[in-house]
């Protein structure tokens, strides 16, 4: 949610409550934002954008097949290894990835 080049970049959601609150929107990745980005990207690039969005989904698909199978965390560290934090099974994260998958299916039939 903030560029790694920013002086306020805090990629890890760790520490006590105050530190976590400070880091909350300053570096961790929020999976629920992927749908808006991916759908806008596909509207601009259409079929030529499919391969990029499929590659973008690869990490999410891998994450959904580990630990709590079929789900995603609320947020992830902004730097590798992208450790999950917050809600373990966060519906908006899962719904967002499913929405992107469904949008990609529409492009397959065209």
Placement of each model-derived feature along the sequence:
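Extended glycan-interaction surfaces of carbohydrate-active proteins
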Residues: 1-30, 59-110
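Hydrophobic, well-ordered secondary-structure elements that form the walls
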Residues: 37, 41, 97
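Structural helix-adjacent loops and short alpha-helical linkers that scaffold large soluble proteins
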Residues: 41-55, 102-110
């Amino acid at each position: 949610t903030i560029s790694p080049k920013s002086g306020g970049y805090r990629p890890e959601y760790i520490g006590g409550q105050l530190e976590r609150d400070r880091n909350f929107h300053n570096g961790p990745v929020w999976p629920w934002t992927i749908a808006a980005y991916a759908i806008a990207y596909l509207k601009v690039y259409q079929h030529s954008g499919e391969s990029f969005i499929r590659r973008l989904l690869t990490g999410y698909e891998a994450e959904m097949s580990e630990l709590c199978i079929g789900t995603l965390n609320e947020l992830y560290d902004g730097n590798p290894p992208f450790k999950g934090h917050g809600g373990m099974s966060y519906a908006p994260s899962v719904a967002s990835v499913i929405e992107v998958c469904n949008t990609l299916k529409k492009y397959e039939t065209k």
